[in-house]
């Protein structure tokens, strides 16, 4: 022991604090450390930089619809590996893994409920289920949502977040673009409003069909929206894309969408829109 150590009093190292795991998270945009409970109150929007984080389909539906009686539509539908598809992994194994990870049968959840007392049907994509890819069950559930609207004279809202068509279902997946578009045409014929809300990301076959067919096309701030991704486009055209290309602000400026709405204002703003649209078309 050195002479300095003999003079100085010994200090005890601070004991490790008993902070429970999982109560903090980090913003992917500004790196701010956030209290999860506070983030939930903000509906998954960073209070520091306004970054809209991805939320699960059920969390979004719980945030958006009134508490109380809700009916899930199409929950009995389950995906099947009709093509016996295999890439680096069997499709049926990918389905099992996705179902286990998300506790969902497929990538779209549909609920019939109320928005500030107004009867509505709301569909929400689950991005954690194979990138929110559109396949046979997704298309069938969306059609069930439309059929419920037609039967009960209700408006439809869809929150999209998807990488596009599910390649493991090949042509069966691509068929859903036409199937969902044809269903929405029936809503239009009957004069029932459909509001499409595009969240980050909304790409591929979903953006090329049901996501862009709203009577009002809404987007969350800074959402990536397009068909092919920016890297693919840059490699194809061999040019550098403009700053913010394919982000919702860029699309609004070019007239591709109608409005950008903060998630925390979504209930009030969409209820206001539907009050006018449904009244006019009733």
UniProtKB/Swiss-Prot annotation:
Tell me which EC number(s) this protein carries: 2.1.3.15
Co-factor(s): Zn(2+)
Q: How the cofactor binds, per note?
A: Binds 1 zinc ion per subunit.
One GO cellular component, as annotated: acetate CoA-transferase complex
User: Mind listing the GO molecular function terms for this protein?
Assistant: acetyl-CoA carboxylase activity; ATP binding; carboxyl- or carbamoyltransferase activity; zinc ion binding
ZnF C4-type: positions: 27-49
Task: Spell out the Gene3D superfamilies in the cross-references.
Answer: 2-enoyl-CoA Hydratase, Chain A, domain 1
Q: Which domain of life is it from?
A: Bacteria
Pathway in which this enzyme or protein is active: Lipid metabolism; malonyl-CoA biosynthesis; malonyl-CoA from acetyl-CoA: step 1/1
Its localization reads: Cytoplasm
Q: Does the keyword RNA-binding apply?
A: no
UniProt enzyme class: transferase
What family does the entry list? Belongs to the AccD/PCCB family.
Q: Please give the name of this protein.
A: Acetyl-coenzyme A carboxylase carboxyl transferase subunit beta
């Amino acid at each position: 022991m050195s002479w300095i150590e003999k003079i100085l009093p010994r200090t005890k190292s601070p004991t490790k604090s008993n902070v429970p795991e999982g109560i903090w998270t980090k913003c992917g945009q500004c790196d701010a450390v956030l209290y999860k409970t506070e983030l939930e109150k903000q509906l998954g929007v960073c209070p520091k930089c306004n970054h809209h984080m991805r939320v699960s389909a059920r969390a979004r539906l719980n945030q958006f619809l009134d508490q109380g009686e809700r009916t899930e539509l199409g929950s009995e539908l389950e995906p099947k590996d009709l093509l016996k598809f295999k890439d680096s992994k069997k499709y049926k194994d990918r389905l099992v893994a996705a179902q286990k990870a998300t506790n969902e049968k497929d990538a779209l959840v549909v609920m019939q409920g109320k928005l500030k007392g107004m009867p509505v049907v709301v569909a929400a994509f689950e991005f954690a289920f194979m990138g929110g890819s559109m396949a046979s069950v997704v298309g069938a559930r969306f059609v069930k949502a439309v059929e419920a609207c037609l039967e009960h004279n209700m408006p439809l809202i869809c929150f999209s977040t998807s990488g596009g068509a599910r390649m493991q279902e090949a042509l069966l997946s691509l068929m859903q673009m036409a199937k969902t578009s044809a269903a929405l045409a029936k809503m239009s014929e009957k004069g029932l409003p459909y509001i499409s809300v595009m969240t980050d990301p909304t790409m591929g076959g979903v953006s090329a069909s049901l996501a862009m067919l709203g009577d009002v096309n809404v987007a969350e701030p800074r959402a990536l929206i397009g068909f092919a991704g920016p890297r693919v486009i840059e490699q194809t055209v061999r040019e550098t894309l403009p700053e913010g290309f394919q982000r919702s602000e860029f699309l609004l400026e070019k007239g591709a969408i109608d409005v950008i709405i903060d998630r925390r204002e979504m209930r009030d703003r969409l209820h206001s829109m539907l009050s006018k649209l449904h009244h006019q078309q009733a």
